[in-house]
Amino acid sequence: MNKDEFKRTVSQYGDAIITYRSANSGKLKYNVCTLDFSTPYIQGKRNRAKEDSNNVLLFCWDTDSYRLLRPANVTSIVPLSSILQNGDKQW
């Protein structure tokens, strides 16, 4: 998945469960993330990470921190709303 497609999909879903293959261990991992940094809670969190051409900066609710994620390693994006049963879209 390319960076633009990834950002468009995650932005459309709001909060999403993103499954990806770890670059270090090769294991499948997941995070509950958002690209919407407008909430006061997220704005109050410190961030030193900088997005580059290969990585996307996300806020992960399950780790309560920002993280850089490489879209090329993503295996699935599921909207959190579909898990909570207030939506039904899946990528």
Predicted regions and their residues:
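Short, 15-30-residue, compositionally biased linear elements
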Residues: R8-Y13, E51
